[in-house]
Regions:
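Sequence/structural signature of outer-membrane beta-barrel proteins
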Residues: 43-49, 88-94, 127-129, 144-147, ...
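Surface-exposed strand-loop-strand hairpins of Gram-negative outer-membrane beta-barrel proteins
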Residues: 45-67, 191-204, 411-414
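Outer membrane beta-barrel
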Residues: 33-39, 43, 60-186, 213, ...
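Transmembrane beta-strand segments of Gram-negative outer membrane beta-barrel proteins
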Residues: 31-52, 423
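Gram-negative bacterial Sec-dependent N-terminal signal peptides
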Residues: 2-30
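Residues that define the transmembrane beta-barrel architecture of outer-membrane proteins
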Residues: 62-69, 100-104, 155-159, 209-213, ...
């Protein structure tokens, strides 16, 4: 009955599959070289509101939102062949109360020429500038990557094939990467009054099969990075067809009485979801850096609020071991979708002996939650402090203001997420070893 919402990490590639890939590599006569490393973040976040924001943050404080522990092994079989395995322990992609161990990377690589790299297996997708290294907090200065942008990718990793070609020109290095692959992931919903099969508020997670293909061009030198990408995602539910709309159904007991019916409507087997991204990180005099990223996605389903754009602009300055920064981020669904959400959310039927008005009215709240729009902005100020070459201490204060609705907010029963003001304080220790 329910379509889609916010994506989370894909499942780990089965170990037997990776073993089969590794055994297919023609080993050289010399011994295999192996390097290993680890990474982690211990992050605490608290807000000034009693309801959850970004799944975990409220005024009780949490270590769950940003904490992660992981490790990586790099194998070099020869000058041309290698393999990488990266695993992590982090909050589950299918539960708000559990932690899971998963593989983020598990691929073999072949470099037939210095400027050509082929990877086969599980790998992170080159969506935004920090998507591939988002779990390694020591590699960027933000206490938390702007959710307005980094939540847009329908999945962050796939099992498949990646081919990248590099071109070196003075002073830039150009890299063109084409990829295709599949993922099994879960997308999250939150119901304010009722959820999919329970007559109580809460979250639920829908299993989704994804096929993703894309072409990404990246240009960089020692100080600057530019990226543009086009992606096509094919998503389908594993248990039933996807509802493409939520039709209005009149009740013949009086004028203008009816409801939006979740049990009816056009259904499709899969969704074709285009995604476009563009990003730049530019170094300026006096150790200033300007970073901006933009992403856009279109989803033609009952969850039409997932169609949205997100962007942010950040300015930072390195001052010795300190790197203070400020950023402004915004995410917004189309105005027509926000109006549809308001119409469904405000729709009510009067009491009548001919139907259960309470059940119908609860279903309208659920239908509005399923539309799942976004309308919010965030301003943040923070800093990182480099304790050692491999560890960072970060602190950040952010203020989020919602408009018509924000599906990042688990709104309390009897209310909604409109016109909310949320202050979040975050502190974290980030390390590699």
């Amino acid at each position: 009955m329910i379509p889609f919402i916010t994506p989370h990490s894909a499942k780990a590639m089965p170990p037997k599959l990776f073993l089969a890939l590794a055994l297919s590599v023609p080993l050289a006569s010399q011994a295999v070289e192996m390097d290993w490393s680890g990474f982690g973040t211990v992050g605490y976040a608290t807000s000034d509101q009693p309801y959850k924001y970004q799944r975990f943050i409220d005024n009780q404080g949490t270590l769950t939102r940003d904490s992660v522990l992981g490790g990586q092994v790099d194998l070099k079989f020869s000058q041309q062949f290698g393999a990488t395995i990266q695993g992590k322990l982090a909050p589950s992609d299918k539960s708000d109360t559990q932690w899971d161990g998963t593989l983020s990377w598990a691929f073999i690589s072949w470099r037939p020429m210095d400027d050509l790299l082929i990877r086969l297996g599980k790998f992170r997708l080159p969506f935004m500038l920090n998507t591939e290294n988002s779990d390694v907090g020591a590699t960027y200065d933000f206490a938390r990557l702007p959710v307005e942008v980094y939540s847009i990718a329908p999945t962050t990793d796939v099992v498949g094939l990646s081919i990248s070609k590099s071109l070196f020109t003075d002073p830039m290095e150009w890299n063109l990467e084409a990829y295709t692959g599949k993922a099994e992931t879960h997308w999250r919903y939150y119901g304010r009054e009722i959820r999919d099969v329970r007559n109580s508020p809460g979250s639920w997670f829908i299993p989704v099969d994804i096929k993703s293909s894309g072409l990404v061009l990246t240009a960089r030198d020692l100080d600057n990075t530019f990226r543009i990408g086009i992606h096509e995602v094919i998503a389908e539910r594993t248990d039933q067809p996807v509802h493409a709309d939520i039709p209005y159904r009149s009740i013949p007991v009086g004028p203008n009485i009816g409801f939006y019916d979740l049990t009816k409507g056009r259904r499709v087997d899969q969704l074709i979801i285009p995604v476009q991204t563009i990003a730049a990180s530019i170094s300026l005099p006096a150790n200033f850096k300007v970073t901006t990223e933009y992403a856009r996605i279109k989803v033609n389903s009952a969850s039409e609020g997932l169609t949205r754009w997100g962007a942010y602009l950040a300015v930072s300055r390195r001052m010795g071991d300190w790197t203070p920064y400020v950023y402004y981020a915004k995410v917004k669904s189309p105005d027509s979708t926000l109006e549809k959400y308001k119409t469904i959310n405000e729709n009510r039927v009067p009491s009548s002996p001919f139907y259960n008005a309470n059940l119908i009215n609860q279903s309208q709240t659920l239908a509005a939650d399923i539309v799942a729009p976004f309308d919010q902005w965030t301003g943040a100020i923070g800093s990182s402090y480099r304790i050692t070459p491999t560890s960072l201490l970060k602190a950040e204060w952010s203020h989020t203001s919602t408009g018509v609705v924000s599906s990042f907010v688990d709104a309390p029963s009897g209310g909604d997420s409109a016109n909310k003001q949320i202050n979040v304080f975050s502190v974290s220790y980030n390390f590699t070893f």
